[in-house]
């Protein structure tokens, strides 16, 4: 059962961030520029996935709660092999009949940790969010057919480092599918569990997609958003595991009869 907590909070003012180089300090605007139903709220939620596992989901518009979850994700990433340090990312948009469309919800996933950040309900950006999205070395963001997502994020004042981003649809194909544009559900059903073939049918695309601006988000949309980010993360992890395993097998096969290679 989810428990929501919310309170009204005023927008934060612009502030100067110091620069140790002695140059003029940058003016940083922490206010979220996207119009919407502003509400400071947090909904923690356990979301069931296949094999009776649970996702630990935090849906929030509160910058401190978002920062806490981002720090937890960074800690998880720090304990991983560098090859597998990735963050699953997905974006939901404002209504297409009210242009210009912008990002309304940003979802991030690392293992079972999921952040569903409700941008249009927020008044202030989390301090950890932009540094996370612009990280240059430590991890890679993984999305699915995400060119549009990146554009909507940029319109909303956020940008993912283009040098640390992978579009999974351009890196993998579902065997025997044959279609040029394959879906996330098809990827997830092939790589994770067959039940994900129906994952996009859990909500009414016409009616429920108009509710992303409602604060707080209803639980069914939180679950939908969390699973999108999770299957993106999990599918890419399996792809990377297979690619790494095949690469190591090729190397091992080339040295199969070499006792010095195996250390005996």
Regions found by a protein language model. Name each.
Residues 1-85, 122, 168, 237, ...:
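N-terminal accessory regions of nucleic-acid-interacting proteins
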Residues 198, 242-245:
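Generic macromolecular interface patches on structured domains
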Residues 58-70, 84-87, 93-238:
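Conserved DEDDh/DEDDy metal-dependent 3′-5′ exonuclease domain
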């Amino acid at each position: 059962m989810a428990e929501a907590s919310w309170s009204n909070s005023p927008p934060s003012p612009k502030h100067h961030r110091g620069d140790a180089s002695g140059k003029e300090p940058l003016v940083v605007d922490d206010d979220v520029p996207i119009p919407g139903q502003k509400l400071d709220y947090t909904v923690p939620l356990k979301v069931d996935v296949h094999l009776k596992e649970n996702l630990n989901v935090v849906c929030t518009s509160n910058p401190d709660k978002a920062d806490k979850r981002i720090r937890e994700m960074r800690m998880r990433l720090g304990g991983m092999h560098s090859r597998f340090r990735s963050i699953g990312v997905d974006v939901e948009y404002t209504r297409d009949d009210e242009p210009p469309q912008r990002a309304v919800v940003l979802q991030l996933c690392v293992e079972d940790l999921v952040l569903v950040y409700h941008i249009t309900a927020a008044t202030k950006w989390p301090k950890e969010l932009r540094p996370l999205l612009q990280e240059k070395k430590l991890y890679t963001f993984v999305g699915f057919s995400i060119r549009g997502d990146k554009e909507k994020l940029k319109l909303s004042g956020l940008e993912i480092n283009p040098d640390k981003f992978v579009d999974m649809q351009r890196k993998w194909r579902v065997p025997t599918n044959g279609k040029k544009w394959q879906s996330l559900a098809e990827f997830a059903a092939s790589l994770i569990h067959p039940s994900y073939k129906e994952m996009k049918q859990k909500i009414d695309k016409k009616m429920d997609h108009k509710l992303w601006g409602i604060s707080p988000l209803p639980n069914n949309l939180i679950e939908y958003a969390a699973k999108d980010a999770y299957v993106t993360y999990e599918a890419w992890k399996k792809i990377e595991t297979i690619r790494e395993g095949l690469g190591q097998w090729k190397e091992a096969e080339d040295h199969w009869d070499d006792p010095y290679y195996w250390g005996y």
